[in-house]
Amino acid sequence: MQTRAPNVESNVYLTHNVHLMSIRRQFIKLRDITKLFVFGIPKFAIGSIDVTNRCNLRCEHCYFFAEDHNNERELSIEKWIEKLDAMKAAVHPMMLCTWVGGEPMVRKQLIEVGRSYFKHNTIVTNGTMDLPDWPNCTWVISIDGTEDAFARMRAPGIYQKIKQNVISHPELNIQISCVLTSITRDCVEDLVREWGPIARGGIIFDFFTPVTGLDEALWLDWPERDRLIDEILRLKKQYPATINMLDSTLELMKSDKAKKVTDNCEFRLKAFALGPTGEDKGKCMMGNNADCDRCGCVVPFHMATIASRRLMLKEAVKRLAS
């Protein structure tokens, strides 16, 4: 049997094309960041869509199921298309959509259609289901603590399954997201060591936000939150390519700065948040029952960083110096 010699020219051509595509993506990212720096975050440039009111888990700290969704009728895909078309016609910038829920992958057909309306897409999933190879998508997989803490927060017996799912998709831009609570607060460094090598998109941390109907005991008081932020900043120096958060964002989450950010929440003022019925959720993706004064969601603090020219210049100088 004759063996075909490898087509060297073809391989060089493919490698060249991949390199050009990478440069193009970096250029587009730089262009978008420059626009944000010059003009600020446009209204409705970013937002969240609850894909579904269904989920295969019931996690201890889930803000979504703190509310009753049993009698909700999910908006059909056809109606979602009409809604997204109307948003586009109204000249919404459509820069980034975060697809949440519920478990978004229960209804991945909606994301498959809807993601084409946005330049960038983030899908927040529990990671128990298969992950499609969609371009221009960041996958955020919720891993709240190391295995024992995770079992208490989410469900026993699925931690290793999710880990294998991440390992089997090295081609995807997967971030690990951990919510720090009274159960997971001692897991930070172990989580970074375990998941850092396999999460291409790095690790991000949130703090539990009290929501009506959820266990108040999960919340970490301000001194503990400040201590953990200092620990994360220390670990960032030790694992610079692993923790995917700006220093300025972490500093804004501290007790002496957080209220100024949440009182002027960029998400509440500029983003959209739509529920499974297609209706507006209120002040943010967590709904109107979230305690904004104790918000631990990284999103408004990250948006506040991006909206500040001073902080963005500070981050740029820091990056150039490193």
Language-model regions, residue ranges each:
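Conserved phosphate-donor/acceptor-positioning beta-strand/loop module used by diverse small-molecule
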Residues: C55, I141-I143
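Conserved alpha-helical substructure of the radical SAM core
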Residues: V12-D133, K318-S322
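Short cysteine clusters
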Residues: C55, C59-C62, C265-R268, C284, ...
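Radical SAM enzyme core and accessory elements
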Residues: M1-I41, C284-S322
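Acidic (Asp/Glu)-rich catalytic clusters
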Residues: K88-V91, S116, L131-P135, W139, ...
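Radical SAM enzyme [4Fe-4S]-AdoMet core and its adjacent flexible, acidic
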Residues: M1-N7, N71, S142, D148-A290, ...
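Hydrophobic faces of well-ordered beta-strands that scaffold small-molecule active sites
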Residues: G47, C97-W99, N121-I123, W139-I141, ...
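Secreted/processed peptides and extracellular or luminal domains of membrane proteins
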Residues: H61, F65-D68, A271, A290, ...
